Design a protein with these regions (language model features):
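Bacterial N-terminal signal peptides
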Residues: 11-17
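Conserved small/polar residues in nucleotide/adenosyl-binding loops
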Residues: 276-282
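Flexible loop/hinge segments that line or gate small-molecule binding clefts
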Residues: 93-135, 146, 153, 159, ...
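Bacterial N-terminal signal peptides that target proteins for export
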Residues: 1-9
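Sec/Tat signal peptide C-region and signal peptidase I cleavage site
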Residues: 17-23
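Short, polar/charged alpha-helical segment
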Residues: 38-55
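Hinge/beta->alpha junction and helix N-cap segments in small-molecule ligand-binding domains
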Residues: 29-42, 59-71, 92, 115, ...
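Hydrophobic alpha-helical
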Residues: 79, 88-105, 173, 187, ...
């Protein structure tokens, strides 16, 4: 079976940073720092900010994507430090809204990345950048159908319910499957972006569904846990497995036949773009 790695590149528009007399802080706050994806965003942002003296960058995030309160506190702290701008990947579409509104009221420009905020925050941030997660979900669904056919049963292993990226990625995957095949879907199951949780969930799904033809993992830690469970169950190469993101573990699972395809975002390019999109203060 042909293995594949597909890239989902993020386009960006160049903005103009305000001219300041001394180095000012741009706070980059992501969903978690314990992820190869977000560390690549960090590397891209560091490369973008190197060689200039107007800005310094700080980079932080909670220990896990489910630690929403910690991320809210980080945004509040950045506001209290009177940073020049905030680049935020919200782990929850609603919980971060009050903090973003406070930043707006304080005259601090905010750029949202990766996952959208709820409509309640409309007008309180300057820009939004992300992978087209709906298009990515459709691409993954097309690949699944091409590999397993239009009949049978597949499972969906997701991460955090209600997050903007998850809604688009998993929602459009499921919608395309239902509209273009007769495949039945088991799940989605939510790992809370915890590898160990995904491993245990996938182990249970495989045991309860011996007739499963395919399985889709929707983000990096979920895919790694999913693939480890498949391998431990001795089902590598026996079940079609498609993942999202592309850290070293996932690439190795492609090589050994546990994963059949992964869809990779341009996380480094996202970070590289973002330092140029922080808008001027109001």
């Amino acid at each position: 079976m042909k293995k594949s790695l597909k890239a989902l590149m993020l386009g960006c528009a160049l903005g103009v940073l305000p001219t300041l007399a001394m180095a000012q802080e741009i706070a980059v706050i992501v969903k978690t720092t314990n992820s190869n994806y977000w560390q690549n965003v960090r590397k891209g942002a560091e490369a973008a900010i190197a060689g200039q003296s107007k800005y310094k960058m700080t980079f932080e995030g909670p220990a896990s994507e489910s630690a929403v309160a910690d991320e809210v506190n980080m945004v509040d702290a950045a506001i209290n430090r009177k940073v020049a701008g905030i680049i935020l990947a919200p782990s929850d579409p609603s919980a971060l809204v009050p903090a973003v509104k406070q930043a707006y009221d304080s005259g601090i420009p905010v750029v949202i990345i990766d996952s959208e905020l709820s409509k309640a925050a409309a007008g309180d941030y300057q820009s939004f950048f992300s992978t087209d997660n709906c298009a990515a979900g459709k691409m993954a669904a097309q690949e699944m159908i091409s590999l397993v056919g239009k009949q049978g049963k597949i499972a969906v292993m997701s991460y955090v319910p209600g997050v903007g990226s998850e809604i688009g990625r998993v929602g459009c995957f499921e919608k395309y499957i239902k509209s273009n095949s007769s495949l039945s879907i088991v799940g989605p199951y939510y790992s809370q972006s915890q590898m160990a949780t995904a491993l245990n969930q996938t182990t249970d799904v495989l045991a309860a569904n011996p007739d499963l033809k395919g399985i889709f993992g929707a983000n990096e830690p979920t895919v790694v846990g999913m693939a480890r469970a498949i391998k431990q169950a001795g089902k590598s190469g026996q079940i079609v497995a498609i993942g999202f993101d592309g850290n070293e573990d996932e690439q190795n699972f492609i090589k050994d036949g546990t994963l059949d395809a992964i869809f990779v975002q341009g996380s480094y390019q996202m970070g590289d773009c973002l330092l140029y999109t922080s808008p001027s203060p109001r």
